[in-house]
Curated annotation (Swiss-Prot):
Phosphorylated on multiple serine sites. Several of these sites are hormone-dependent. Phosphorylation on Ser-294 is highly hormone-dependent and modulates ubiquitination and sumoylation on Lys-388. Phosphorylation on Ser-102 and Ser-345 requires induction by hormone. Basal phosphorylation on Ser-81, Ser-162, Ser-190 and Ser-400 is increased in response to progesterone and can be phosphorylated in vitro by the CDK2-A1 complex. Increased levels of phosphorylation on Ser-400 also in the presence of EGF, heregulin, IGF, PMA and FBS. Sumoylation is hormone-dependent and represses transcriptional activity. Sumoylation on all three sites is enhanced by PIAS3. Desumoylated by SENP1. Sumoylation on Lys-388, the main site of sumoylation, is repressed by ubiquitination on the same site, and modulated by phosphorylation at Ser-294. Composed of three domains: a modulating N-terminal domain, a DNA-binding domain and a C-terminal ligand-binding domain. PANTHER family: KNIRPS-RELATED PROTEIN-RELATED (PTHR48092). This is Progesterone receptor. Keywords: Cytoplasm, DNA-binding, Isopeptide bond, Lipid-binding, Lipoprotein, Metal-binding, Nucleus, Palmitate, Phosphoprotein, Receptor, Steroid-binding, Transcription, Transcription regulation, Ubl conjugation, Zinc, Zinc-finger. PROSITE patterns: NR_LBD, NUCLEAR_REC_DBD_1, NUCLEAR_REC_DBD_2. It is found in: Nucleus; Cytoplasm. The modification Phosphoserine is found at S20, S81, S130, S162, S190, S213, S294, S345, S400, S676.
């Protein structure tokens, strides 16, 4: 086989022949040095360097250095019969060619005539210099994979129409009519997916000006005959500068791509022997059809069409998507992409670009390449949706990062994964072609950029334990991940790796587009967790997710299973903590009615009746006894209301022995609320004796009983007594266990808020203890009987204070109970904003409530009576708030009218009244109540 060579610009012209083609025509075999250094090709292995798809090569032709483009003569249009004859003679010449370096002169002249006829400018009188052959650039393959080129000894004489001529059984006149239209179809395009043929005389690109079509430099795309040529891509397109020779016969025509008309490169795919239909040049003439030319001369397929327009990134991506969809959706043929990096890239002239990389011109100006997002199946996801590929093991670090899809680009442009039928599909087998393995082993420097493998921040919800942790980066996952986890709990749309080792190991099956968890129905959102799917993807936490039936069988408290809430009285399902004990609603109501109604229940048996869910109503006496044994007290509800106050156990080991029938849960709860002696407040059994020892001495009022009582003298004597008692309260509080642990400001505040309550409560105790509640015993020298009360100006107030000793008489309050209640009165009112030592205050108050329970148990031997007594005493403490409020109001009015009433107020008492009483009366304090009103 011989190659057609063009004449030099100054070679002798054939007599009577057509004009010689100019320098740089497609008939030249070896192109001269072009404007791009490093893009020289060789005869045997023409390796073309990658240059960008820029405007310099496609739109603006650049002549070779040192070449003067000659003017091309315009020839008249010849008839179709002349073209067919020339094509037949050219085919005969090629078939008879031997080792001669040039064809016969006659045939060469006829071939030149045919080429000058078909490739002439569209209009007469128009001339344009042809692009030099040295501007052979890297091919831009968008419609099929390619493999390393054939051995150098393979014949390289095929031109644009060589597939038509070399096909077995094909004659010069066979390609006519409709058959020719099917023969020019590309390999991956079926007749049902044909593009609409453009109308005659109309350009295929709207808005594109009609320009002359100079002769382009053709680059033949060679492909290897293999079974996987349509499923995977080779490392790089290898293009050879070929002669664009031959003319169409019987309707076939040589066409010029629009990109070549502006100085680009025409892609001439090599013949593939596997298919009966030949592969022709995927090029097209952009000029209108000449009047004397065959209709098929301008009806080549509009397959790879680069418009002669100033291309922007969006237009290029949109056109690429259109071209790729036309081929990749037909028959499942794979699509190959071999974009070149920009010219400014350091590797633009020598380093091959890995298959699947976009050029920088395909990105927005400020966009950073990110991880790839390839869908495995034909239903492509939105381009803006980023689904990070799962990294499987240490092999993932060897993978070269790939570019992220830009808006408008079809994911089918990436050849790494085959387009197959809908899911489910098995993982792809390891690649068997050396070209594909070379792509996976390409260094990261050949890629556009190194994308970080850190996942979205939108994917750190549920992670699975398998896989290596992702690398730390600017978008590293937060530290809330489980140890050793690298992906979400729900498998994302993972894709098989392109490396052989990762593909052999097998990747997680992709779940896109039908999201499902291990074959379960589709989830509504990715954060959903199905317990049935956890054994496959989330094994580390399965030990803590136990069925409810198993959890209820374990009576012990553990991390794995929380105890079921059951009533400690009857065993029914508990509704909450009522009166300090975990009980059901029925036992709660029963205990409240039994305690407030003061019923005297009697057991018909031996006080050992069974109380359960079925028989809890049989014996109310045993049910109430069990409630009290469990620790239910009416005051426990109030303790929970005030911030962090511990629930009080009505029966303690000191007051009552531990019952035998209390369940383990009740014992555990009782131990939780037992005060530890190792804390700051040392509450020991002789505490009541300590309270007795620090009780103040007898305080005298200094009233002169020899003189008749007047309103001013009596009130003045009471104020003097109040001043002395206030000093006594300060001294007593300093000796009170636990009070010095509070902040100094809290100590002063508590004394100022409670001094009136302590004074009137002491008055009631003295009246009850000394005169059995018949008179008001203010001091040994100031005792008011009922007659003196009536003569005083505050008789109504005396009747109010007289209620306290009468209650003591009614309840028969013991000294131990009084001492504990007195301490609780000191801790009975706090500011609205709380105290500085609020925690210590609550601990102290809870401790003295327990001491009151112990004091009650010293005299009350019955459990029921003890609980009722506690309720009555705490109810008395709550009633003191209203009584003391009346005293505050009278004291403040007297203080304001002290000069008019001639009543003297001591200095310290005056300061307390002026500073705190207005605040107390305005409701700016918080009384701590045991019971609701």
């Amino acid at each position: 086989m011989t190659e057609l060579k063009a004449k030099g610009p100054r070679a002798p012209h054939v007599a009577g022949g057509p004009p010689s083609p100019e320098v740089g025509s497609p008939l030249l075999c070896r192109p001269a040095a072009g404007p791009f250094p490093g893009s020289q090709t060789s005869d045997t292995l023409p390796e073309v360097s990658a240059i960008p798809i820029s405007l310099d090569g496609l739109l603006f032709p650049r002549p070779c250095q040192g070449q003067d483009p000659s003017n091309e003569k315009t020839q008249d249009q010849q008839s179709l019969s002349d073209v067919e004859g020339a094509y037949s003679r050219a085919e005969a010449t090629r078939g008879a060619g031997g080792s001669s370096s040039s064809p016969p002169e006659k045939d060469s002249g006829l071939l030149d005539s045919v080429l000058d006829t078909l490739l002439a400018p569209s209009g007469p009188g128009q001339s344009q210099p042809s692009p030099p052959a040295c501007e052979v650039t890297s091919s831009w393959c968008l419609f099929g994979p390619e493999l390393p080129e054939d051995p150098p000894a393979a014949p390289a004489t095929q031109g644009v129409l060589s597939p038509l001529m070399s096909r077995s059984g094909c004659k010069a006149g066979d390609s006519s009519g409709t058959a020719a239209a099917h023969k020019v179809l590309p390999r991956g395009l079926s007749p049902s997916r044909q593009l609409l043929l453009p109308a005659s005389g109309s350009p295929h690109w709207s808005g594109a000006p009609v320009k002359p079509s100079p002769q382009p430099a053709a680059v033949e795309v060679e492909e290897e005959d293999g079974s996987e040529s349509e499923e995977s891509a080779g490392p790089l397109l290898k293009g050879k500068p070929r002669a664009l020779g031959g003319a169409a016969a019987g309707g076939g025509a040589a066409a010029v791509p629009p990109g070549a008309a502006a100085g680009g490169v025409a892609l001439v795919p090599k013949e593939d022997s596997r298919f009966s239909a030949p592969r022709v040049a995927l090029v097209e003439q952009d000029a209108p059809m000449a009047p004397x030319r065959s209709p098929l001369a301008t009806t080549m397929m509009d397959f790879i069409h680069v418009p002669i327009l100033p291309l922007n990134h969006a237009l290029l991506a949109a056109r690429t998507r259109q071209l790729l969809e036309d081929e990749s959706y037909d028959g499942g043929a794979g699509a190959x992409s071999a974009f070149a990096p920009p010219r400014s890239s350091p590797s633009a002239s020598s380093t091959p670009v890995a298959v699947g990389d976009f050029p920088d011109c395909a990105y927005p100006p400020d966009a950073e390449p990110k991880d790839d997002a390839y869908p495995l199946y034909s239903d492509f996801q939105p381009p803006a949706l980023k689904i990070k590929e799962e990294e499987e093991g240490a092999e993932a670090s060897a993978r070269s990062p790939r570019s992220y899809l830009v808006a408008g680009a079809n994911p089918a442009a990436f050849p790494d994964f085959p387009l197959g039928p809908p899911p489910p599909l098995p993982p792809r087998a390891p690649p068997s072609r050396p070209g594909e393995a070379a792509v996976t082993a390409a260094p990261a420097s050949a890629s556009v950029s190194s994308a970080s493998s850190s996942g979205s921040t939108l994917e750190c919800i549920l992670y699975k334990a398998e896989g290596a942790p992702p690398q730390q980066g600017p978008f590293a996952p937060p530290p809330c991940k489980a140890p050793g986890a690298s992906g979400c709990l729900l498998p994302r749309d993972g894709l098989p790796s392109t490396s052989a080792s990762a593909a052999a190991a097998g990747a997680a099956p992709a779940l896109y587009p039908a999201l499902g968890l291990n074959g379960l129905p589709q989830l509504g959102y990715q954060a959903a967790v199905l317990k049935e799917g956890l054994p496959q993807v989330y094994p580390p936490y399965l030990n803590y997710l136990r069925p409810d039936s198993e959890a209820s069988q374990s009576p012990q408290y553990s991390f794995e299973s929380l105890p079921q809430k059951i009533c400690l009285i009857c065993g029914d399902e508990a509704s909450g903590c009522h009166y300090g004990v975990l009980t059901c609603g029925s036992c709660k109501v029963f205990f409240k009615r039994a305690m407030e109604g003061q019923h005297n229940y009697l057991c018909a048996g031996r006080n050992d009746c069974i109380v359960d869910k079925i028989r809890r109503k049989n014996c109310p006496a045993c049910r109430l006894r069990k409630c009290c044994q469990a620790g239910m007290v009416l005051g426990g509800r109030k303790f929970k209301k005030f911030n962090k106050v511990r629930v009080v156990r009505a029966l303690d080991a000191v007051a009552l022995p531990q019952p035998v029938g209390i369940p383990n849960e009740s014992q555990a709860l009782s131990q939780r609320f037992t005060f530890s002696p190792g804390q700051d407040i040392q509450l020991i059994p002789p505490l009541i004796n300590l309270l007795m020892s620090i009780e103040p001495d007898v305080i005298y009022a200094g009233h002169d009983n020899t003189k008749p009582d007047t309103s001013s003298s009596l009130l003045t004597s009471l104020n003097q007594l109040g001043e002395r008692q206030l000093l006594s309260v300060v001294k007593w509080s300093k000796s009170l266990p636990g009070f010095r642990n509070l902040h100094i400001d809290d100590q002063i505040t508590l004394i100022q808020y409670s001094w009136m309550s302590l004074m009137v409560f002491g008055l009631g105790w003295r009246s009850y203890k000394h005169v059995s509640g018949q008179m008001l015993y203010f001091a040994p020298d100031l005792i008011l009987n009922e007659q003196r009360m009536k003569e005083s100006s505050f008789y109504s107030l005396c009747l109010t204070m007289w209620q306290i000793p009468q209650e003591f008489v009614k309840l028969q309050v013991s000294q131990e109970e009084f001492l504990c209640m007195k301490v609780l009165l000191l801790l009975n009112t706090i500011p609205l904003e709380g105290l500085r030592s609020q925690t210590q205050f609550e601990e102290m108050r809870s401790s003295y409530i327990r001491e009151l329970i112990k004091a009650i148990g010293l005299r009350q031997k019955g459990v029921v009576s003890s609980s009722q007594r506690f309720y009555q005493l705490t109810k008395l403490l709550d009633n003191l708030h209203d009584l003391v409020k009346q005293l505050h109001l009278y004291c403040l009015n007297t203080f304001i009218q002290s000069r008019a009433l001639s009543v003297e107020f001591p200095e310290m008492m005056s300061e307390v009244i002026a500073a705190q009483l207005p605040k107390i009366l305005a409701g700016m304090v918080k009384p701590l109540l045991f019971h609701k009103k």
